[in-house]
Amino acid sequence: MPVTIHAVEKALFKIFNNDFLFAIPPYQRPYAWTTDQAGELLSDLLAFLGDDAQPIDDVNPYFLGSIVLIKDADSSKADIVDGQQRLTTLTILLAVLRAQVPSEYAQEITKYLYERGDVIIGTLNRYRLNLRERDEKFFREYIQDENGINGLLNLEKKQLSDSQQNIKTNAIYFNNALTELTEPQRVRLLQYLMRRCYLVVVSTPDLDSAFRIFTVLNARGLDLKLSDLLKAEVIGAIPKNQQEKYTEIWESEEEDLGRDTFQDLFAHIRMIYRK
């Protein structure tokens, strides 16, 4: 039976909706974008947005790149194979915008971050983007939930993981940059982001196909290393109930050795193996 690969271009408001329930598998690397990548993204958006007088729908669209998902056509659940850095950063940007636009816009932004639960019938909030287990609670509390950004900006210095520190640093960067804009400019940026910015969504229900696509569709973001691909292959093959355990072991060793040295280790292993 042939593997189905589906690719479609979608505006961002069609990404952060009920059609997708994104999850970052434990074998993925932690959030790694710094203010270099986040700053470039925001600068590009503002440059494309251009003249304040031009109607939003007449402004040239902006292509955000592609994301690769493991997703069945009849389900909203989508494991992110490639694109987590962009989706996480876009979520941070939306959260910061929510804190700086009028309430009627802020309420709409919340719908893009999570579907509100119902206390009467006992349903929980349904978050559009679910980070890896170790960062999930932090991300929900300080990014996705209302007033989270204010709490993050005032968060006293404490022990944060590298990925959590990157989340906080990028949120502070966006907050400072957006403060330099007028309120109408922030609203205009929000409208442009959701209506005129596009992602190509590549999805397949097949894990192997997703990883093959993953190796050739990393056009933006941090450069992948062979160890990233190997990690995805190895950890992805482990039963799901053990993936978090072995991901922690893998990342602990990578942190101890350093990313570049860890990469070199596999080159040496390969040379030994070939002998």
What is each of the regions a protein language model found here?
Residues 78-90, 200-204, 220:
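Conserved catalytic-core segments centered on acid/base and nucleophilic motifs
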Residues 57-60, 101-132:
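Flexible phosphate/Mg2+-sensing switch loops adjacent to catalytic phosphate-binding sites
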Residues 87-103:
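Short active-site loop/helix that positions an aromatic residue
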Residues 1-81, 199-200:
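Short alpha-helix boundary/capping and kink motifs at helix termini
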Residues 4-22, 126-152:
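Short, compositionally biased low-complexity segments
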